A protein has these predicted regions:
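Hydrophobic alpha-helical membrane-insertion signals
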Residues: 1-26
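Helical catalytic core of nucleic-acid polymerases
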Residues: 36-40, 51, 87-94, 102-103
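Anion-binding and metal-coordination hotspots
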Residues: 3, 55, 60, 66, ...
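Basic, short loop/linker segments at the boundary and entry of helix-turn-helix/winged-helix-like folds
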Residues: 18-67
Length: 535
């Protein structure tokens, strides 16, 4: 069955440019037809219980028009409606039928939002198939985009207030001789409400006849209940706020409860303000200049977004990336272990990459199978943790290095220590993490690693440049995590379709990647210079 086809002829003044653009649109419609996205739309169409009444718009052409507008224009709903009236290319796609903005909004909510990942990946797979793209090298990066929320209507997670209120409630229960009704854990509003009800029943307190205002004398039991009820109202409020925030964030906004308070990059780099704004953390996975996967997160950093992004990629492409290169924001032990477990070749920079590359913070310790060695070729002695050297990491091991007084590298090794004159130093390391960092270091410094690092800057940063600058997308228009995710999907799909349309003439996907010269040698970090101590 042909889903995406122009069936209704419309009168358009012919011109050479129109013919070229219409040919591109026909190829774009063929791409959608071959991708299988029509089956998804058909499934939604015939399972929609609200499709009563007169016949609606052609959903396939409506979908094609929305995707085309996101690729070519600043695609707000009213802008798409405007293009359906005045732009010949969009008018050609919708066959002269002009939907209004509410129809477009309902279509996005009913057809695209529930099946956004399926729609996104099936179109991408068809582009990869047509141009025979190599997607073995993948790059992940993120950016923060401002949410559509009132920046003054923010709420902080009331953790401290909740703890203080819990102490007050327990003190009140002690006054009421109910100390056996609670444990050391935080009292829930449900249990506290039951305690108050039982207290009223045992003391014959009529809740409706407790007088308010000055000059009204109350019994001790009535005073206790009145104060306890005030605490109950506050407790319910705090629990509701903590439930909205969840475990992984400390704030939300009243006008968009899924948005989180963040410092945006514009504020950070301009140095004009460090005020918090409502925002979302947008992550994309790019390969061969094609956005293969996207994700919308509430995390303020990129540390914990790496694994969910790769899991999404595996879920919809049935494989993990062969090689992956990311910046130092993703370089932690948990992510390195994940890459080893799933056979992903590690080109992810670690936290001290820039320090080692510049020579300001060089590598001071080297790990081998039997232990750790320092720059002065002293082997570290594994010692137990004590009162002065507390364990900071679950897998950490404490090492002691002796012979520091005659070491010519101590000016670097002890630069950040208070006691620089001692003949020893302690360091806590994770041996397995150090081995994984060494593997990443060797991969990144190899000729293949140099090529991947340069292409990471070209592809991933160029993608964000397309979205933010060329497509003028710097603020999210929808509210709620699911709808925001669908909007980001449409923007990412718009970037891919834009590149697809520009590559149709050449029959080759435009690729600005940098290739390694044949005589390129391995990069070497600067060595640490020895500095003799003054006698």
């Amino acid at each position: 069955m042909n889903y995406f086809s122009i069936k209704r002829p419309i009168f358009i003044v012919p011109s050479e440019k129109c013919s070229v653009e219409f040919e591109k649109i026909d190829k774009f419609m063929i791409l959608l037809e071959k991708s299988g996205v029509g089956k998804i739309i058909e499934y939604v169409k015939y399972n929609d219980k609200n499709c009563k009444g007169r016949r609606g718009y052609n959903p396939y052409n409506l979908f094609a028009a929305i995707i085309y507008c996101f690729a070519k224009f600043n695609a707000t709903l009213r802008d798409i409606e405007d293009k359906c009236i005045f732009d010949l290319r969009v008018l050609y796609i919708v066959e002269g039928c002009i939907p209004d903005h509410s129809t477009l909004g309902n279509f996005i909510n009913n057809y695209i939002v529930p099946y956004q990942y399926e729609i996104f990946t099936c179109i991408n797979k068809q582009i990869i198939k047509e141009f025979n793209l190599d997607i073995s090298n993948c790059y992940v990066d993120g950016t923060k985009i401002e949410a559509n929320a009132n920046k003054y209507k923010f709420v902080w997670k009331p953790t401290k207030f909740h703890n203080k209120l819990d102490i007050k409630i327990k003190d009140l229960l002690n006054e009421m001789d109910l100390e056996k009704t609670y444990t050391n854990d935080l009292i829930s509003s449900y249990n506290y409400n039951l305690i108050l009800k039982k207290y009223c029943f045992d003391n014959n307190i009529d809740v409706n006849n407790i007088s308010n205002g000055r000059g009204k004398k109350l019994a001790k039991e009535q005073k206790n209940y009145k104060k306890g009820y005030e605490y109950l109202i506050k407790l319910v409020e705090y629990e509701e706020k903590e439930k909205i925030c969840g475990e992984n964030r400390n704030s939300y906004f009243k006008t968009d409860k899924d948005a989180t308070a963040m410092v945006l990059k514009e504020d950070y780099y301009s140095k004009l303000s460090h005020d918090f704004h409502a925002g979302y953390n947008i992550q994309v996975l790019v390969s061969s200049l094609l956005i293969l996967m996207y994700g919308v997160f509430q995390d303020r950093t990129d540390f914990n977004t790496f694994i969910p992004m790769n899991n999404l990629y595996y879920k919809y492409y049935n494989k993990y990336p062969k090689n992956e290169c990311d910046d130092a924001g993703y370089g932690n032990y948990k992510n390195y272990k994940y890459m080893r477990e799933h056979s992903i070749k590690n080109y992810v920079k670690f936290q001290n990459w820039e320090g080692e590359a510049s020579g300001k913070n060089p590598q001071l310790f080297y790990t081998f199978n039997d232990g750790v060695i320092c720059l002065n070729t002293n082997i570290g002695e594994q010692v137990p943790f004590d009162y002065y050297h507390r364990k900071r990491n679950k897998d950490g091991v404490l090492y002691k290095f002796n012979g520091c007084s005659d070491c010519n590298y101590s000016y670097k090794c002890k630069a950040k220590l208070k006691n620089k004159d001692e003949d020893y130093r302690y360091i806590e390391l994770i041996p397995d993490y150090e081995l994984l960092k060494e593997e990443a270091r060797n991969n990144l410094l190899s000729p293949k690693g140099i090529e991947i690092r340069i292409n990471r800057s070209i592809q991933i940063e160029g993608t964000f440049g397309q979205i933010k600058n060329n497509m003028n997308y710097d603020r999210i228009r929808r509210r709620g995590l699911e709808k925001v995710s669908a909007e980001i999907m449409l923007m990412c799909l718009g970037v891919n379709i834009r590149r697809y349309l520009s590559s149709i003439d050449e029959n080759k996907f435009k690729n600005n990647c940098w290739n390694t010269p044949e005589n390129l040698s391995k990069e070497i970090f600067p060595y640490v210079k020895q500095k003799k101590k003054k006698v």
